[in-house]
A protein has these predicted regions:
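Internal alpha/beta loop-helix hairpins
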Residues: 180, 189-254
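Catalytic Walker B motif of ABC-type/P-loop ATPase nucleotide-binding domains
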Residues: 154-158
Length: 351
């Protein structure tokens, strides 16, 4: 997908000015509430008309104020998944799914209904009314309806924000299937850096209606370590565990991690904040933290008044953070060895 968009839209107390050129299949739009993310995608989808400018998607002009071009939403072949699922309450799950499919010209119908139902695990829900579904089930149906419209681009506008944490991370694999299973590029809109890292490769950062930055999702997280109350969130995909003295032991890097909130499933995904990793220059004699990892510094970076420290523990990568004074006192440089202490309770299982 290649998108070029230079548009302006003025409201009573807000002006959006977008001037971007971006390519890729997994693009994120990041910003706080009210920054202009939804306005941006509404103009792209044709739901909102810019005051002036031009929008070109994959070589086709969707809007041009100078040329008098403004394709209708249905002509643009762009589907949307919203924060609120927006399903038709009088239709069954199956008929909700088929709604967009039936309105898609036959020449564009490349996605098989049965395949989609299997991938999104909707087999047992087809005859049910949507009002009886859980929040996660409704969002899967909304996603399926959008995919069956066979769009050339899918816009996902805060699709996880109405769900609790456990449901959010259950839904993410289904959202990723848009690109991985069906080959549809997407724009994913969110104010969550963790969601950006799980869902996107390239991120457009919007602030006060202006495109401020185009970067990778990983760099976005690193750039904000200094002013984020939760720091940098390490995401650890860990495999088979065993129980040890009331804790769960997971193989990791050059050794193991002891975790309180584990389980005995084959795989689990954990969050670990950079703020929960304490660094030592020498091996401490005795500490209460159950994990003490001998690591090698592979990079450092500054963000605000903090220093991010990227550590290698075997093949596992972790990012810790310290204040600049501590970085100087510990003489943290690339190649030096540090001990990372982490409490077993610091890990949060998210899937």
């Amino acid at each position: 997908m290649h998108l070029s968009m230079m548009v302006n839209k003025k409201f009573a107390s807000f002006t959006l000015a977008a001037d971007i050129t971006v390519s890729g299949d997994r693009i994120g739009i990041f910003g706080t509430s009210g920054s202009g993310k939804s306005t941006f995608v509404s103009m792209l989808a044709g739901l909102l008309i810019p005051d002036n400018g031009e929008i070109v998607l994959d070589g086709e002009c969707l809007f041009s104020s100078s040329k008098g071009i403004n394709l209708r939403p249905e002509q643009r072949r762009i589907a949307m998944v919203f924060q609120q699922h927006c399903l038709f309450p009088h239709l069954s799950v199956k008929n909700n799914l088929l709604y967009g499919f039936k309105r898609c010209p036959a020449k564009y119908r490349t996605i098989n209904f049965d395949t989609l139902v299997t991938v999104l695990k909707l087999e047992g829900l087809l005859d049910r009314g949507v009002t009886k579904l859980s929040g996660g089930e409704k969002q899967r149906v909304a996603l399926g309806r959008a995919i069956l419209a066979n769009p050339r681009l899918l816009l996902m506008d805060e699709p996880l924000s109405a769900l609790d944490d456990s449901l959010r991370f259950q839904i993410i694999p289904y959202l990723k299937s848009v690109s991985e299973q069906f080959g549809i590029p997407y724009l994913f809109i969110s104010h969550s850096i963790v969601e950006m890292r799980l869902m996107t490769d390239t991120v457009l950062f919007i602030e006060h209606g202006t495109m401020m930055e185009q970067t990778s999702s990983e760099q976005l997280a690193r750039n904000r370590i200094g002013n984020s109350p939760v720091g940098y969130i390490n995401l650890l995909q860990l495999g088979q565990s065993r129980q040890v003295d009331g804790l769960f032991s997971y193989g990791c890097g050059a050794g193991e991690l002891l975790i309180s909130a584990g389980n005995e499933k084959s795989e689990a995904l954990f969050e670990l904040s950079s703020k929960d990793i304490m660094l030592f220059k020498k091996h401490p004699e005795a500490i209460s933290a159950r994990n003490l990892l001998k690591c090698t510094v592979i990079s450092t970076f500054e963000s605000g008044n903090r220093v991010g420290v990227e550590l290698a523990y075997g093949e596992q990568r972790l990012i810790a953070e310290v204040v600049k004074q501590a970085a100087n006192e510990l003489n943290i440089v690339v190649g030096s060895e540090l001990y990372a202490a982490i409490k077993a309770s610091a890990f949060r299982r998210i899937r």
